[in-house]
């Protein structure tokens, strides 16, 4: 009788662990799908602004500065109201390591974590979309004239 109870307990434990492992994998795939659909929504708005002019302190709808642009695209793409400045957006976002960077994450540029002066949105392939002196453009994240301080996830 003791052997039967032991076998039953082992079988039940194995079944339970498989059940939870499957649920965890399912949740992970759902989270990934959600991230992709969120990026698509925000990027759809961002693409419509390509070529719009840069104006310091502007939040849109036809002129932007960098943080005004990210604030605008997240508000109109996802209904998320980001803080106004790049520094405030850095503090607001969940920090992610470069190896975990996903499309839609924010890219923060500055001299240090206490002095962030530019922000853009990662679009994949080592590029971001941002508003800078040439207007709203797609460009490489890494350039000799700036220093990436970190990355942040909004949603």
Predicted regions and their residues:
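Stable alpha-helical elements in mature extracytoplasmic
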Residues: 38-42, 46, 65-66, 70
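Sec-dependent N-terminal signal peptides
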Residues: 3-16
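Hydrophobic h-region of N-terminal signal peptides that target proteins for export
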Residues: 17-21
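Aromatic- and glycine-rich peptidoglycan recognition patches
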Residues: 2-4, 23-39, 44, 80, ...
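Catalytic cysteine-centered active-site loop
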Residues: 33, 52-103, 148
């Amino acid at each position: 009788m003791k052997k039967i109870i032991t076998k039953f307990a082992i079988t039940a434990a194995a079944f339970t662990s498989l059940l939870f492992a499957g649920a965890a994998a399912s949740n992970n795939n759902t989270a990934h799908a959600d991230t992709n659909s969120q990026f698509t929504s925000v990027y759809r708005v961002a693409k419509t602004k390509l070529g719009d002019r840069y104006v310091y302190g502007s939040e849109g709808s036809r002129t932007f500065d960098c943080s005004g642009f990210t604030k605008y695209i997240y508000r109109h793409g996802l209904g998320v109201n980001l803080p106004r400045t790049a520094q405030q957006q850095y503090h607001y976002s969940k920090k992610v390591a470069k190896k975990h960077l996903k499309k839609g994450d924010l890219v923060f540029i500055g001299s240090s974590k206490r002095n962030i002066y530019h922000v853009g949105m990662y679009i994949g392939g080592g590029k971001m979309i941002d508003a800078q002196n040439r207007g709203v453009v797609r460009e490489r994240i890494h350039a000799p004239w700036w220093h990436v301080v970190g990355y942040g996830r909004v949603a």
